[in-house]
Amino acid sequence: MTIDPNNQTVLRIAMLRDHFIQHDRFTPLEELFSRLAEKRLADIQTGRVNEAHGLALSGPSGAGKSAAIAHLLKTERARLDDEGYGDATIISLRVPSPATLKFVGQTLLRALGYQISSERQAWYIWDLVRHHLRERRVMFVHLDEAQDLASRGTKHELNSVASMLKTLMTDDEWPVGIILSGTEELEDILNHDPQLARRMKTVHFESLSPAAHANDVLDLLESYCERAELIPAPQLLSLEHGERLIHAAANQFGLVIELILEAIEEAFLQKDTALSCKHFRRAYQLRTSCEDEFNPFIIPDFYRIDARQVFTRGGRRS
């Protein structure tokens, strides 16, 4: 049977995406969560009921938060399962829209495998949430895109959700740790409620700096080339290319990885054995539909380009 080259490329890229490359910013996130988990396990093993604590990860869109959290939770879930605590110790979900107290509760119940009528009142839904968290012995609940908890913009709704999160963490029978990840607006939610903030450890993913992080990005590029079995062209390993790549990714770590993978995909599709600048040029063009004069992998003065813009053309500048 003949294998479709496009399907083969998709599979190879999927395997590369599944591979998580450890980076400096991941280490404090991993260490903080490990401490929280060990404290929670110690309480369970000794039969003590202490309030749980949580972890909040903030950063700009494209900073790589989702990939870091997904890898962290996958690893910790497997570890806890191996130690006999089951495979449902950590529940992860994306904050729904609208992020009302009732809708968040319903979404969490569904993640716990329980369906409920939308006619039920919020207090009843959250009583069920606490019951099922306890019955399934869930240790942590992760809410991704947690900045949306404040999307309705009303203090009342924000206060209600923050209060319920604190209630989960201080439950007198089965306290549950809360993990929040989201954009920098998440910080406003924590600062709005000091009681919630004091129960959270915090990590922030900063934007990259071309001057400070170009070499790190080149190391990352080499690592992906090795896994993809591609030879990096000499010009790709220059400091200038590292700076171009960071700028093209709007200074965001997660977008750097996306661009690298998209360039590798172009090399696979063209059946090239080496990764070169032409693949990055094409990847950026496909991502933004920009003309050559607005492609940071082509022009000399690439810093003048606003890499957050798409459809950039000579007669249509932002």
For the regions a language model picked out, list residue spans one by one.
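Post-Walker A helix-loop "phosphate-sensing" segment adjacent to the P-loop in P-loop NTPases
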Residues: K74-Y85, G113-I116
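Walker A/P-loop-proximal flanking segment of P-loop NTPase domains
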Residues: M1-H53
